[in-house]
């Protein structure tokens, strides 16, 4: 009579192997994911808001009226002192595909940045990138309705690019190829999978500049920084400061009576 010990060991080995494979897949796609990461809770909030927007629209996808009601970036509405529209677009998405693609890629890259710099610095980078991006977007494309987390996503990409460029000369050729490919693929995917039929180029640009400026600031005490580091840091910081200071008054003065036509 055959002992069951061997089969039990084999079964347990298979289960452990499957568990390791699952953990390996999870760590590859979402490195270091856990409930103590703020980006995980932001992602949950974005999913909840998408469900709410679909319920209000009575459809599987939110309509423009609902997105407008819930806080999409729209310059004429911002000019009516609806200042929250620089942040609320982060939690709104136009389609389920838009939601999934934005969140998967942004979650993937954000986990690394939050682990590296901590929750406070990560949140500053995430939200300030979105604010700068949405302000620039509304200033340059005032009649476009914009939603999505890609302004913040490009801030994270900008931060990654800045961090890698600072230590570029110290990386091996293999790491250089890996980082270059990672940043390029993420940028291209988020760029081409943005809201609607158009791409919010200015929103992405503003977010990217803010991410570069902030991560340069976090690393400014590193020894042996490249000669161009200060130019990059002060240049991006000056552009972001200009957007933050100039955009709100221009938007408030430029469209003071237009919001009534959009209701």
Curated annotation (Swiss-Prot):
It catalyses: Cleaves type-1 transmembrane domains using a catalytic dyad composed of serine and histidine that are contributed by different transmembrane domains. GO terms for cellular component: membrane. Its EC number is 3.4.21.105. The chain crosses the membrane at residues 37-57, 86-106, 121-141, 142-162, 189-209, 231-251. Its main location: membrane. The keyword Hydrolase applies. One of its GO terms (molecular function) is serine-type endopeptidase activity. It is a multi-pass membrane protein. GO terms for biological process: proteolysis. The active site is at 150 (nucleophile), 204. It is found in: Membrane. The keyword DNA repair does not apply. Keywords: Hydrolase, Membrane, Protease, Serine protease, Transmembrane, Transmembrane helix. Serine protease involved in intramembrane proteolysis and the subsequent release of polypeptides from their membrane anchors. Belongs to the peptidase S54 family. This is Rhomboid-like protease 3. The gene is ROM3.
């Amino acid at each position: 009579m055959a002992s069951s010990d061997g089969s039990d060991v084999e079964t347990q080995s298979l289960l452990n192997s499957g568990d390791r494979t699952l953990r390996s897949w999870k760590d590859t796609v979402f490195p270091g994911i856990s409930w103590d990461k703020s980006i995980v809770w932001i992602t949950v909030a974005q999913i909840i808001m998408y469900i709410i927007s679909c319920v209000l629209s009575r459809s599987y996808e939110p309509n423009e009226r609902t997105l407008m009601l819930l806080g999409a970036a729209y310059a004429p509405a911002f000019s009516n002192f609806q200042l929250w529209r620089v942040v609320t677009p982060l939690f709104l998405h136009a389609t389920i595909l838009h939601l999934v693609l934005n969140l998967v890629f942004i979650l993937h890259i954000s986990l690394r940045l939050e682990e590296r710099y901590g929750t406070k610095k990560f949140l500053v980078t995430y939200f300030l990138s979105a604010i700068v991006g949405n302000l620039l977007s509304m200033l340059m494309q005032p009649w476009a309705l914009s939603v999505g987390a890609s302004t913040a996503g490009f801030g994270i990409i900008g931060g990654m690019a800045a961090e890698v460029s600072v230590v570029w000369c110290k990386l091996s050729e293999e790491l250089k190829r890996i980082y270059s490919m990672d940043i390029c693929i993420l940028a291209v995917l988020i760029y081409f999978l943005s809201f609607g039929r158009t791409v919010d180029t200015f929103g992405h640009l503003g977010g990217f500049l803010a991410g570069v400026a902030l991560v340069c600031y976090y690393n400014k005490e590193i020894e042996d920084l490249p000669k161009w580091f200060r130019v990059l840091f002060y240049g991006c910081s000056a552009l972001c400061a200009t957007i933050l200071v100039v955009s709100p008054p221009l938007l408030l003065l430029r469209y003071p009576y237009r919001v009534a036509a959009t209701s």
